[in-house]
Amino acid sequence: MTNYNSNDNRFNGRCFLEDVEIKLQKRLEEIGQSLSDGQKEIDNMQEYYWENYTEMDEYGYEDYDNQQALLHQVNANNEKLQLKHRFEKMLDAPFFGRVDFMYDGDDEPEPFYIGIGNFAEKTGMQPLIYDWRAPVSSLFYDYDKGPASYEAPAGRLDGEILSKWQFKIQNGELVYAFESDTKIDDDILKKELGTNSDVKLKNIVRTIQKEQNAIIRNTKDRILVIQGAAGSGKTSIALHRIAYLLYHERDTLKSSNILILSPNSVFADYISHILPELGEENIREMSFDLYAYKELRKGVAADCEDRYDQLERRMKFPDESAQNRFDWKQSKDFIGEIEGFLAILEDRLIEFKEIEFRGMTLTEEDLIQLFYYKFTETPLLKRMDAVKDYFIDSWETLKGRNISEDDQEMLQMKFDKMYTTKDIYTIYNWMLDDCGCDLLLEVPYEKRKLPYEDVFPMLYLKYRLSGGNSTHKNIKHLVIDEMQDYTYLQYTILESLFHCRMTILGDRAQTLDTKQQDVLRFLPKLLGREIRTIEIKKSYRNTLEIARYAEKVSGVSDLELLDRHGKEVVEKTFNTDTELLDELVCHLKCPGDFETAALITTTEEEAFDLSRLLKLRGINVSYVDRNSSAFKKGLTVTTFYLAKGLEFDQVFALRGAKENPLKNQAEYICATRALHELYVYEIADSLSK
């Protein structure tokens, strides 16, 4: 036990907590008063503006000055409001760690308390509590007692860690405090992981491990690819990395510059609170599938088959030839087919016709020269527009006047008529015909529904013919979750859309394909930029009993497992669905101390039927399907593919049919959702319809 500086309250966690809570309260009162004064100032400015704007100078200088002053005050109030929210969060648990560090050349150690944010008595003063992302905080995560160093803005600072402390504070009360010899004590880690699951992903600032910290604080690698086992904390690591980057690059990187590609809305809701909890604004999230559907509804097809419909069909009606066709259409080889088709498309698509307009002529030879040489870099379906604009600019320059809107529309029609068609759906069918594939139905736009296997090939063709979507140019960091479920074609499209830093994460064992796809084999070559791959083999989520069971299902046996024990996995077979329901009702009416439970099925039909039957038995059920946007405490009934990324205290997994090609993946994903208890059930007869 450390006993230096016994008269300095900074080395007494309980005394320091009492002191810092008083100072936090005082700062909150000051900020509250400042916010009130600022709002009065804003109200006065707005009142002055509306009373006097008609008398302001004709050049608008006074108007501009007033608007700028108002904007400055609004921004100042917003910053204070964010600070207020952070301090209110800190009041509940101001800090969770402390490092007593003695710099080389000093005689006395300096205590550094670590929390979710910086806190000082006054702006500009030395912090009493340091943000977990601050350079000095790396001492807490990366070192034991003894020699240590950290990288400060001025350079590396060396010294010695004399002691490290870990604290748990709830509602402003100290629950425990102890001196730790290790980085993050295993007992603390097991205690944290042994608590019940919530309906939201937990932040991990109190228990970040050394290998996790290295990933979070990585700023050197432009593209970071993380292969992490189920329960390794890879999603938490990615979100904490984003929080770290937002903190250290706050002058150039904002929340609006970051985009997460997540698998579904339920998962997006599950992770949505992490960044606000860490003191940052939330970031944009989208599903790449939904993005593709939206893009293709712009003039290509009125509807697209949902990915989950395609997945359900594969499970219910296994068809090897259909799966092979799907795989081929998402492959590098099929991209080659599209590119080969595009190379010869121009002759088939364009018929040049001389343009004459009010004394100015564009001959076929002129058109060919402009189309094939001057504007060769312009996408094919946009190229004639470039030629038209060139012609109009030339005419207006020669004549010294502008062309009327009616004449512009007439010229647009003339240039458009040189295309045999501009319908990408029709052009895609030409390509399918050239490849010897079955064609899509030749129907009007409003009756078109793209099979899922054609969604991303069609999107790729659209972007090659018309150019990509430029609305994401402000994105400076892209996070891709569940990387194993993206195809080569999807990564190719993403690479063309986003020229930015990336954090890509997933687990090859949780693929939604019949074969494990190791994207690490092709990502370095495809992305062709600075890329680093990291594999995390330590799993924290499950008890040892559940983790060992999951290993048997997946065949993955090289994981490092936390030595946290619990109940053995229960496997049970029932003759009818009635017997299964009796068993479930018995468990669910006596849930014990668990806050979250899940009944996870293979197919959507099974999930829907079971949720309906359980409701008839008086069980409170939250049914989660592809259209859900959140899940609640209590019992969730859903499919394995929607449960990916989530965790529950207790899981009841229903085995699928033996002929289901995704049976093993489904069982592995179900098993690895369980924190404390896992029941694996099977029924001989199909569920009641």
Predicted regions and their residues:
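Extended, charged low-complexity regulatory segments
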Residues: 1-205, 209, 213-217
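Conserved phosphate/pyrophosphate-binding and hydrolysis machinery centered on Walker-type P-loop NTPases
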Residues: 194, 198, 328, 377, ...
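Conserved helicase motor core of SF1/SF2 NTP-dependent helicases
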Residues: 251, 256, 265-281, 286-290, ...
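A structural signal for short, well-ordered beta-strand segments and their strand-loop junctions
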Residues: 98-100, 225, 260-262, 679-682
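A general structural signal for short secondary-structure junctions and capping/turn motifs
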Residues: 85-91, 98-106, 155-159, 166-168, ...
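Conserved motor-region signature of P-loop NTPase helicases/translocases
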Residues: 82, 112, 160-195, 199-273, ...
